[in-house]
Amino acid sequence: PVVRGFEASRVLLMVDGVRMNNAIFRAGHLQNIITVDNMILDRVEIIYGPSSTLYGSDALGGVVNLFTKQPQLFKSNITSKKAAWNVDGNLVYRYGNGQNEQRQHIDINIANNKWAYLTSFTNSSFGDLRQGNKRSSTYPDFGKRFFYVARENNIDVVKDNSASVNIQKLSGYNQTDLLQKLMYQPNENTTHILNVQISNSSNINRYDRLTETSKGLPVYSEWYYGPQVRNMIGYKLTKSQLNGYFQKLTTNVNYQHLEESRMSRRFKSNDKEYRFEAVDMVGLNMDLLHQGKSSALNIGVESYYNNVGSTAYSNNIATNVRSSIATRYSDGPTNMANYALYAQHTQFLKGNWVLNTGLRLNSVQLNANFKDTALMHFPFTDANQDNTAITGNIGMAYNGAAGLRVSFGASSGFRAPNVDDLTKVFDTRTGYVVVPNKDLKPEYTYNTELNVSKTTSTYSIGASLFYTWFKNALVVDKFKWNNASSILYQGIMSDVYATQNKAKAIVYGFNVNGSANLTPNTILAATYTYTKGNYTNQKPIGLNTALPLDHIPPSYGRIGLKHELKKFSAEIFTVFNGWKRIEDYNLNGEDNEIYATKEGMPAWQIWNINTSYQPTKKLNLSFQIENIADLNYRYFASGISALGRNYVVQARYSF
């Protein structure tokens, strides 16, 4: 997700109170959020900007909190010495023709008045994605898949795909997700929850790399991610009505094991490269809450420890002979630790005013060791970081009469370089290689914002303004490796780049939103967001304008009209993105201008219809049409076009 112009490692992802960001979260585009099963999601909460000291490093753009469903206790009215048990759950089947999407889901809740077990399983299959057929006359071939590579008789062959250019060959994948939660509540003031989550995918092709060409031929025959694995086990204890100053204690202890891998082979080459990464992460969070008559105080401690393993080799697919290649990250013992103390205070003042203040002490240590330095001719054998920062926030809110709310505040954010920033060796495109830089420093942001909203029984309207100063920003720029500006990497002479603290930047923007009850059953809702960002100390060569900050999306919004009856609901809505002109792209960053048109990414607008019908209390049927006009469009910075017209049917049976 992109939040206020920041994404990837600059946005903090949380699931059930557990930090997902790990030591190898990269600054580019991430797919880690797909490892949280949306079939069992209860809600998503977004905190914009570094406005809460409850969250630490990485929350520059904000925090995305994902909450999965909780086990539900069964409170029986029957008086008996034996606790009554109850079983309920859901069966879901979903099909979408746009990429032959098939999803099967089941969740079961077994409970009495003290114990509850929730089990969820989802199997997902996605075929090759079909893009829209309706294109602009200015770009009649944009996104068309004219070819793909196949292996026939041990030879790479370019296959003609001109008969089905809208089918983005080799873009499908499969995924399974398992969740198990156990809740024990011996009394109303104590709750124990054991949380197990397992997510695993098939190989996932890097579609954009498979479309690259050089001198009229494909660059790659194979480029895919191996199975993306996220295993988590967590224990959460909540105790309330405590004696003493603090009334509530929340403790969360968790362990995660994560795996990523990348496999690639150039066209007509027999050498296939394998790179494997594994992260083991242990976390602890303890929070105490005091709730007074006119104030509230949270204090807490947090700690996360990451251990990273990175291996690599090349295998000749003809002879099956292995050879050494550079690992993606440091190949020796590598670890990263985060420690924090925080306090957040809320004071309820006279006249409907509320004052929020907070402080957080952050400490981050990183130790990386490079064992095999010969391949890349490393000028060092280790890289170490020890960073400490104090961040804070202050804000005022006014909760007035008739639903008026006004709030304004200032906050600071901090992100320490991680293993991905510090030790990575990779190429985002042919002839371009990023090398490690051990001299990195933390990034800092300073944020101000103003929020105004008005809510009544018939309408709501709101607006938010924000402005962020970005200091010590990490950017990828030209670099010298052993005093050379280009090196041989994967058999290609490549220009050398590295992550560096070279930039100061500003990010600013606004959001407006509103909804109105046109009738008791009909709601009109709309939202619009605009973001702008640029470096303040860098300019493109030969230009007087400021260099654009990467990751900044074009303006976007949504307008929808929804009508709800007792058993039936329907919504028609439009989603739109503005132009992202090529002069607004950062050509050295992560904006991926090579996958846009020569003018940039065109504006687009699609229309969708959602309907739902509930014939009985236990059965719900839904039907959707996405991208009704079958428009061909692509999200900014993406290397794959979005779905064309897509018919989706879903059946949910509750028992």
Segments predicted by a language model, with ranges:
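Short acidic/polar hinge/loop motifs at secondary-structure boundaries
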Residues: M20-P50, L54
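Flexible loop and strand-edge segments within Gram-negative outer membrane beta-barrel domains
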Residues: K169-Q175, Q185, N189-F246, H257-V279, ...
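Outer membrane beta-barrel strand-and-loop segments of large Gram-negative receptors
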Residues: E277, M281-D287, N338-A340, V435-K441, ...
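N-terminal periplasmic accessory domains that precede
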Residues: V2, L13-M14, L30-I34, I46, ...
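Transmembrane beta-barrel wall of Gram-negative outer-membrane proteins
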Residues: Q99-S125, R135-N203, V229-N231, F348-L349, ...
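Gram-negative outer-membrane beta-barrel transporters
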Residues: K350-G351, L355, S363-V364, Y467-W469, ...
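Signature of Gram-negative outer-membrane beta-barrel scaffolds
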Residues: L297-A401, D427, Y497, K539-N544
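Surface-exposed extracellular loop regions of Gram-negative outer-membrane beta-barrel proteins
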Residues: S202, H257-S261, S314-V321, Q365-M376, ...
